[in-house]
């Protein structure tokens, strides 16, 4: 599985309130949520991003509320992956559970700038910066998480457990 | 071995699958839980409760329909629904639901509040909670713990909120992600103990828990907090860890004060604020949100509600209130709020152009009287 798109870079502590403000939580329709993705951080984001683009951020991405609407909004907007130095734990679980690819890659975050063309190979964790001609590596997922990802998300993982 | 390692039965860093003794959700997170649940499961195999606290009673048809959907689901699966009686975390405590429980999961990030009762309680998202409903269990990565030992007793203007704000500034540059905080030697009442474990989430802690005796064995870090030397603190916009002494922001004009929420909406906290407002008039919009109907009832019985009403405050029905900007007390463009809640992220309470400051209920009440952020020391 691969992803390719332009990078949009933000800072540390991007919280779920700016990813999807609570005033838009009166729906669980991903398309509706996507219309407000990152609205309080960068109101232009949803107009300037193209499907496949990649969000790059610093430490503790997705901190705050447990709302699964946050990764849903990002995924439904067409973002192909989020690369961060670290993720807040509930967001980390939520993203994996709903199948939004996330990568912890501090070195990549240091180097990538907004507008860089990025290609990610999820099977190897290799992140290629086509603009700068550089290659970075994401931290590998713990074995347990890999099991869930390989199953295709938590719902599928649970189905298999039930079948046992 | 830390308290949490003992409860989860393993060493920090390990991932384990464990039975969940109690799982709960609210009107805000239930719709996505139902969606995920229905993809895989037919039967609920967990001890579950649902609370309507985020946007209750329903202000729009859309929300009324979502709540109807939740009721239908709950009825089908025989899950109790508690509507409008207060905030989930507070009600779990009041209803004694954690008795005989060691592991609790809530579909809300402030579920760790229950750690004040010595249980391991964590917040999770909708899909995780749906799977817990269906399987009765889930996986946990056993966190490393930071031991926080309190010493002495706080002065009369210092509350549990200040202990956490102080802790947030101590841990600002320390990586708390996936780690927990274990508190020891806590001199507070239950009302205030719940504030500690509720608010510690904002340090990015996975959870907080209060223990009896500190062994010192197995902790990644140890912190001592001298309560006697603490002074009232304030978190500036737009992050709870943006902490300064109240003097530094004294004189900041405010448009709204909110006293309440799962952080500071219990009887002790609201009555402390009411003592300050008694016989006075507030200078700005002042909203009080009891954490539960029991708190509200006691406020009426003990004359606290009268003091607040006569001072000009508006008392909301029990629930999350203005904390998350979805229902009552939403703030407008450019407005400045002083709130006793736990989050001051941009846009949290309404307009993304509003500014939210956080403080303890005493500072909030005194500031309501002056219409600006005021140091309670010297002012009362």
From Swiss-Prot, chain A:
<dbReference type="InterPro" id="IPR015928">
    <property type="entry name" value="Aconitase/3IPM_dehydase_swvl"/>
</dbReference>
<protein>
    <recommendedName>
        <fullName>3-isopropylmalate dehydratase small subunit 1</fullName>
        <ecNumber>4.2.1.33</ecNumber>
    </recommendedName>
</protein>
<comment type="pathway">
    <text>Amino-acid biosynthesis; L-leucine biosynthesis; L-leucine from 3-methyl-2-oxobutanoate: step 2/4.</text>
</comment>
<dbReference type="InterPro" id="IPR011827">
    <property type="entry name" value="LeuD_type2/HacB/DmdB"/>
</dbReference>
<keyword id="KW-0456">Lyase</keyword>
<keyword id="KW-0432">Leucine biosynthesis</keyword>
<dbReference type="Pfam" id="PF00694">
    <property type="entry name" value="Aconitase_C"/>
</dbReference>
<dbReference type="InterPro" id="IPR033940">
    <property type="entry name" value="IPMI_Swivel"/>
</dbReference>
<comment type="similarity">
    <text>Belongs to the LeuD family. LeuD type 2 subfamily.</text>
</comment>
<dbReference type="InterPro" id="IPR000573">
    <property type="entry name" value="AconitaseA/IPMdHydase_ssu_swvl"/>
</dbReference>
<dbReference type="InterPro" id="IPR011824">
    <property type="entry name" value="LeuD/DmdB_bac"/>
</dbReference>
<keyword id="KW-0100">Branched-chain amino acid biosynthesis</keyword>
<comment type="subunit">
    <text>Heterodimer of LeuC and LeuD.</text>
</comment>
<keyword id="KW-0028">Amino-acid biosynthesis</keyword>
<dbReference type="GO" id="GO:0009098">
    <property type="term" value="P:L-leucine biosynthetic process"/>
</dbReference>
<dbReference type="InterPro" id="IPR050075">
    <property type="entry name" value="LeuD"/>
</dbReference>
<comment type="function">
    <text>Catalyzes the isomerization between 2-isopropylmalate and 3-isopropylmalate, via the formation of 2-isopropylmaleate.</text>
</comment>
<dbReference type="GO" id="GO:0003861">
    <property type="term" value="F:3-isopropylmalate dehydratase activity"/>
</dbReference>
Curated annotation (Swiss-Prot), chain B:
<dbReference type="GO" id="GO:0003861">
    <property type="term" value="F:3-isopropylmalate dehydratase activity"/>
</dbReference>
<comment type="pathway">
    <text>Amino-acid biosynthesis; L-leucine biosynthesis; L-leucine from 3-methyl-2-oxobutanoate: step 2/4.</text>
</comment>
<comment type="similarity">
    <text>Belongs to the aconitase/IPM isomerase family. LeuC type 2 subfamily.</text>
</comment>
<feature type="binding site">
    <location>
        <position position="320"/>
    </location>
    <ligand>
        <name>[4Fe-4S] cluster</name>
    </ligand>
</feature>
<dbReference type="GO" id="GO:0046872">
    <property type="term" value="F:metal ion binding"/>
</dbReference>
<protein>
    <recommendedName>
        <fullName>3-isopropylmalate dehydratase large subunit 2</fullName>
        <ecNumber>4.2.1.33</ecNumber>
    </recommendedName>
</protein>
<dbReference type="InterPro" id="IPR018136">
    <property type="entry name" value="Aconitase_4Fe-4S_BS"/>
</dbReference>
<keyword id="KW-0456">Lyase</keyword>
<dbReference type="Pfam" id="PF00330">
    <property type="entry name" value="Aconitase"/>
</dbReference>
<feature type="binding site">
    <location>
        <position position="323"/>
    </location>
    <ligand>
        <name>[4Fe-4S] cluster</name>
    </ligand>
</feature>
<dbReference type="InterPro" id="IPR001030">
    <property type="entry name" value="Acoase/IPM_deHydtase_lsu_aba"/>
</dbReference>
<comment type="subunit">
    <text>Heterodimer of LeuC and LeuD.</text>
</comment>
<keyword id="KW-0004">4Fe-4S</keyword>
<keyword id="KW-0411">Iron-sulfur</keyword>
<keyword id="KW-0408">Iron</keyword>
<keyword id="KW-0100">Branched-chain amino acid biosynthesis</keyword>
<dbReference type="InterPro" id="IPR050067">
    <property type="entry name" value="IPM_dehydratase_rel_enz"/>
</dbReference>
<dbReference type="InterPro" id="IPR015931">
    <property type="entry name" value="Acnase/IPM_dHydase_lsu_aba_1/3"/>
</dbReference>
<dbReference type="GO" id="GO:0009098">
    <property type="term" value="P:L-leucine biosynthetic process"/>
</dbReference>
<dbReference type="InterPro" id="IPR036008">
    <property type="entry name" value="Aconitase_4Fe-4S_dom"/>
</dbReference>
<feature type="binding site">
    <location>
        <position position="262"/>
    </location>
    <ligand>
        <name>[4Fe-4S] cluster</name>
    </ligand>
</feature>
<keyword id="KW-0479">Metal-binding</keyword>
């Amino acid at each position: 599985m691969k992803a390719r798109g332009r990078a949009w870079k933000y800072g540390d502590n991007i919280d779920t309130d700016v990813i999807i403000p609570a005033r838009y939580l009166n729906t669980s329709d991903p398309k509706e949520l996507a219309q407000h993705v990152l609205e309080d951080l960068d109101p232009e984001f949803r107009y300037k991003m193209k499907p496949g683009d990649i969000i790059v951020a610093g430490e503790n991405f997705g901190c705050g509320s447990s709302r699964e609407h946050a990764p849903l909004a990002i995924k439904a907007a067409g973002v192909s992956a989020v690369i961060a130095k670290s993720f807040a734990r509930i967001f980390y679980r939520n993203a994996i559970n709903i199948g939004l690819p996330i990568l912890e890659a501090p070195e990549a975050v240091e180097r990538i700038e907004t507008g860089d063309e990025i290609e990610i190979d999820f099977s190897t964790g290799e992140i290629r910066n086509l603009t700068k001609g550089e290659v970075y590596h994401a931290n590998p997922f713990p074995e347990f998480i890999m099991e869930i990802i390989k199953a295709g998300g938590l719902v599928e993982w649970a189905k298999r457990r039930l079948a046992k | 071995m830390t308290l949490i390692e003992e409860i989860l039965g393993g060493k920090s860093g390990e991932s384990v699958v464990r039975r969940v003794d109690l799982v709960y959700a609210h009107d805000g997170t239930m719709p996505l839980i139902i969606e995920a649940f229905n993809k895989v499961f037919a039967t609920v195999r967990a001890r579950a409760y649902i609370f309507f606290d985020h946007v209750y009673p329903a202000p729009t048809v859309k929300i009324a329909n979502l709540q109807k959907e939740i009721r239908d689901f709950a009825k089908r699966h025989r899950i109790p629904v508690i509507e409008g009686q207060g905030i989930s975390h507070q009600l779990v405590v009041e209803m004694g639901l954690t008795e005989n429980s060691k592991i609790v999961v809530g579909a809300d990030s402030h579920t760790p509040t229950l750690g004040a009762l010595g249980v391991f309680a964590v917040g999770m998202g909708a899909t995780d909670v749906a799977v817990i409903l269906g399987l009765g269990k889930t996986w946990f990565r056993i966190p490393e713990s930071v031991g926080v030992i309190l010493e002495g007793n706080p002065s009369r203007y210092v509350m549990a909120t200040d202990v956490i704000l102080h802790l947030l500034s101590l841990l600002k540059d320390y990586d708390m992600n996936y780690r927990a905080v274990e508190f020891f030697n806590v001199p507070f009442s239950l009302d205030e103990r719940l504030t500690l474990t509720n608010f510690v989430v904002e340090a990015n802690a996975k959870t907080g828990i209060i223990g009896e005796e500190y062994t010192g064995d197995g902790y990644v870090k140890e912190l001592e907090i001298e309560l006697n030397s603490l002074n009232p603190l304030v978190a500036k916009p737009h992050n709870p860890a943006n902490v300064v002494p109240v003097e530094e922001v004294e004189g900041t004009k405010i448009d709204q004060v909110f006293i309440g929420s799962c952080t500071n909406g219990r009887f002790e906290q609201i009555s402390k604020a009411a003592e300050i407002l008694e016989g006075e008039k507030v200078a700005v919009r002042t909203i009080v949100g009891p954490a539960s109907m029991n708190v509200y009832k006691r406020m009426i019985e003990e004359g606290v509600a009268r003091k607040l009403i006569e001072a000009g405050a508006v008392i909301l029905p029990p629930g999350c209130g203005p904390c998350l900007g979805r229902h009552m007390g939403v703030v407008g463009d450019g407005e400045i709020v002083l709130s006793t809640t736990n989050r001051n992220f941009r846009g949290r309470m309404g307009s993304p152009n509003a500014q939210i400051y956080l403080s303890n209920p005493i500072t909030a009440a005194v500031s309501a009287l002056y219409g600006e952020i005021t140091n309670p020391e010297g002012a009362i």
